[in-house]
Amino acid sequence: MQAYTEIAPPTAVSHAITLPFLSSRSNNLIVAKNSLLQVFELKSTVTEVASGGEGEADNAAANFDTEAADVPLQRIENTAKLVLVGEFPLAGTVISLARVKALNTKSRAEALLVAFRDAKLSLVEWDPETYNLHTISIHYYENPDVPGLAPWDAELKDTYNFLTADPSSRCAALKFGTHNLAILPFRQRDLAEDEYDSDNEAAQEGKAERANGANGDDAVKTPYSSSFVLPLTNLDPTLTHPVHLAFLHEYREPTFGVISSSKATAASLLTHRKDILTYTVFTLDLEQKASTTLLSVPGLPYDLTQVVPLPHPIGGALLVGSNEIIHVDQAGKTNGVAVNELAKACTSFALSDQADLALRLEGCTLELLSQDTGDVMIVLNDGSIFILTFSLDGRNVSAMTIQPVPADNGGNILKTRASCSTNLGRGRLFIGSEDGESVLMGWTSTSNQLRRKQSNTAQSGDDEDMSDVEEEEVDDLDDDLYNDTATTVKKITAAAAEPTAPGTYTFRVHDVLPSIAPIRDTVLHPGKDTESLTKGEIMLSTGRGAAGAITALNRELHPTMLAQTELPSSNGVWAVHAKKQAPAGIVADFGQDAEANASSDVDYDQYLVVSKAWEDGTESTVVYEVHGNELSETEKGDFERDEGLTLSVGVLARGTKVVQVLRSEVRTYDSELGMEQIIPMEDEETGNELNIINASFADPYLLIQREDSSVKIYKATGDGEVEDVEATGLSGTEWLSASLFQSSSFTEVFAFLLTPEGGLRIFAMSQLEKPSYVAEALGFLPPLLTMDYMPKRSSAKATITEILAADLGDATSRSPHLIVRTSNDDLVIYKAIHSPSRSSSDLWTHNLRWVKLSQQHVPRYMEDGAQEEAADEPGFESTLLALDNINGYSTVIQRGRSPAFILKESSSAPRVIGLSGNPVKSLTRFHTSSCQRGFAYLDSTDTLRISQLPPSTHYGHLGWAARRMPMDAEVHALAYHPSGLYVIGTGQPEEYTLDPNDTFHYELPKEETSFKPKVEHGIIKVMDEKTWTVIDTHVLDPQEVILCIKTLNLEVSETTHQRKDVIAVGTAIVLGEDLATKGNIRIFEVITVVPEPDHPETNKRLKLIVKDEVKGTVSAISDLGTQGFLIMAQGQKSMVRGLKEDGTLLPVAFMDMQCYVTTLKTLPNTGMLLMGDAYKGAWFTGYTEEPYKMMLFGRSKHHLECITADFLPFEEQLHIIVADADMNLQVLQFDPDHPKSMGGTRLLQKSTFHTGHFPSTMHLLQSRLHMPTASEFTTSTTSSLPLHQILCTSQSGTLALITPLSESSYRRLSGLATHLQQFLDSPCGLNGKAFRAADVMEGGWDAGTQRAMLDGGLLMRWGELGEQRRREGLGKVGW
């Protein structure tokens, strides 16, 4: 019984599409990351771009008129940034996205059609009222009774399934199975008026479709008609081997082109099956469910893989192969271009020769740049960018030309291949990648600029002033072409007829979506030093090709410590920056004094105020002057230092007045700390003195909360006087929490107040007579908080102790959020939305709603009771604090025993990330010349730490602190040496040339081609952990590839039995498929050398002590036993070896395997060994040292394709978790007493869990926590056993934990999972339980009653429920 929990979401972008989704006038980007759907909007910012800047294209010529010869070195450009609107985890794997102009959507925009791996289609729209996806319908076709599915056909998971949609939204087609096509028609407005209905002969579809009214009288209410499955062989009997299809532009009826053949294509059969592909165009009759063949082009090259439809003026489609690109127009006329020498050998089709380009088009992506010219961008497998241009003769294509984009024009800004691309309009493209970071890039064209300048249209002079939406309407590539006038067609055709000159296009990176996919190898540092910045808790090798990198992940934030000092008995710190008041008679708004604001130290903090509570009960305040990171105590001014405890310090009156809040009074000072005002706190009716418990600043307002739960508001006038503000709406009411909120998006200041009953009141400072917003149901923590929301039961309320409204975001985008803290330190985050949208003249609270965001942070858990008691002392209570500029972030900090930051990037959701170290008493911003935009905090040890956020670190995309170091090469393996080194196995592609002296290929003719294949040449790099610089490099033999690297503690002397940490490297020498593969095992030791001048980190090198060539690849290495031996998988054997003093490896034991060993894992402190075979499953073996012997204990009884595996011990049971090639986790158990285990020789199959991500590594972890068990199951033996977990990584970039569960915990969590599935929204209408349940192996489960692995991701969504649903769920499971 286990739980699988994703602790980091997928980051590999698999699909992307652009459409107006949020509203009819919006321009949104939809991104699919395997099982995560994200919705973005674009925000334009103004940035400075340096001419010839590093890593970016110099597009100055495209942004200025040709007459302006003296272009400045620094120029201002509009840069587009991605802003996340929402993200939705899916219970399915996305295989395609398509846009549909559906009728009557809630947002009055277009709908999104999502296709999933198991032949499902979901039609979704945006619901502005709930700020969420709304599923219109779901259609599924995996039913084995669907016509056209034969029993011998391949399974759905083994076929290429994809979705394509008609450009005019008349229908969509899902190709699934071997050759089946599911057609889903959509109603059009003109068809709806004619009462078009084809539902009388409805094909078999999902129950969800019928429930939405697909049949009967309600059919006219749905935006779709009944779908039907059409076997491709019904269209043409020769379509037995379809390759690809796509709908085409400019046809009156839905029309698609298909590449297919009647026989299977293969490079090995080229002499017999040359040019056997056929391109056929069919038009569909949706009413008759029939088709008509329009044209057929036979004799096409065998390697064509893709159909790319082109709109007017080019029209037709591009057929993309590995060695050529062919254009077929609407009349069937073809034009092609060969891009390398192999095109002559693989086809006899007539092609123009551009073989000198030597391109490899495998895995390339094509995207239309401009509809005016018809130019197409090609992104190759290595990220290189080329431009395909057309020459027109009238309206016919006469020739095609491919040109490379020079590096100076941005041709190398992409590091790896693209998985998807989409055109966002206005010269912006999104390039998604599964192998590295995804890029939002911009392009400009000098020819377009000149053409636009010479145009006489009125819009040409107003382009710069047009809004994003207006310009998008002009540049939309998907506009209906039927309404184009003849004049427009003539202009576009003339533009396309002009050939594009080389160097015309210039590309520049606008924004980046960070990615850690694919994860290739992992190094763990569970006990790392908290002060180390470059040594993450998890070190990952990520990316492919030139996008390869090393990424350091930290679960908590480890700030850069600049200085620290001891401040005994302190409990509060505040940094203060005060400005001198302007002379009398001069009134200047903040920000208008340009000269003063431009000075370098205009915002630097001058004072640090520290409040202290001594052990004898006395309280005092100390003022320090700040000089960089140095503090010096000062007696300057009249600042109150001895009378009472300082509760808060802030500034008012545009920063000219310093305000000190004491227990019983408020004092104001000038910029030199000279006394100006004393405001006592007294009861207005009785005159009794009242103590202050909280204060909140929002210039020019000050909110004071007093011990009788009353609230007073003060305002700084123009002359600096702080006066009481009459607030009749606030008087006579008790308030549990109160704070002020001032956003960067509006000027009004609001007061957020919490009633003891859990109600929310928002007051505008300009209207304090009554609240501008009332939400009585905040205490119920509903998923959507509105003014009129009220649940049926009024008793199920959460205990809310504090609320705080603040902007969250970065320099690009900030938005208001409401943070709610409960009595057990849980944080609930609400995002402010407006539905319907408000006008700019309305108050911000008009039509305001709050949407609860999903967040999975759990407060810090402490098992040490003494520490917990200490954390409850005065000064350790949790409080929230909003800071507006911490290294560019607008953030909220939670102080107390579980300190945390709430951080958000513009393209990510808010994430709660804990602050490492001790509990935090107080925290303040700290901005000086030595600590730019940093912070200072006081921890439980009375240490003041002046810190900054770590540089070049992302937080929001993973919920981890992630720092990436590019390696510019793919990293295959990674290991850590205790001397402080990382050993990295990389490779460099190089051209392969046949050896003229090769005796194995004597029958081959002499090689004459210049277009040679590329093979990898392995390189070992050594990186210092502190500086992240490469200090040593070892180049391996030609064609030698690194497969694994491990740090082993081996015995290096047979006489003294000395042990030493060494580096073992396993490699493969790949000579071709017709020769046996060899491998090498290399053993390196780390030696100390004389460092290079000024580089002390270069004092270590690797020294080769063993190099042993073996038959077969060395695919896995591990340490074994207690005598310092190693075990290695060499070919089809697993062999135990010992290191001798003469530099040789002595074999002492071995075991024969069957195919290819993918993993070797040992259980620490035992002789147990787990070996995984790529085709034959898992082997559980043992090793003994007296005598040296290996023995087989048990094997999996099914033929698993084992990718990786590991042990999972729990209590007195031993489980084995195997990750297979179908993205499943197989749970096996070694139980020799079970009758089905045949005496232990067969591992029991306990359960199967589908992850949806292709696995890469597994690592056994020992947790610092202990699993809670019911008292009746607890024994003195099991209670002391440590809890183990398995960390899983995947090629999608996910991190996941597999946690074993006790019987009682499993039963309760299983009940909660059932409760959550019932009440949580499932995006796209998918079944989460069915998604996680994999197919049952032959022979069924061995556990009698199957105990499926729990979906921890579902359980972590517990916070999305309202308090009423939570209590219902807890009541069902007995909590």
UniProtKB/Swiss-Prot annotation:
Compartmental location: Nucleus
Disordered: annotated span: 194-219, 446-477
Gene Ontology BP term (one): mRNA processing
Bias (Acidic residues): 461-477
Single GO MF descriptor: RNA binding
Biological role: RNA-binding component of the cleavage and polyadenylation factor (CPF) complex, which plays a key role in polyadenylation-dependent pre-mRNA 3'-end formation and cooperates with cleavage factors including the CFIA complex and NAB4/CFIB. Involved in poly(A) site recognition. May be involved in coupling transcription termination and mRNA 3'-end formation.
Entry similarity comment: Belongs to the CFT1 family.
Name of protein: Protein CFT1
Organism of origin: Phaeosphaeria nodorum (strain SN15 / ATCC MYA-4574 / FGSC 10173)
Gene: CFT1
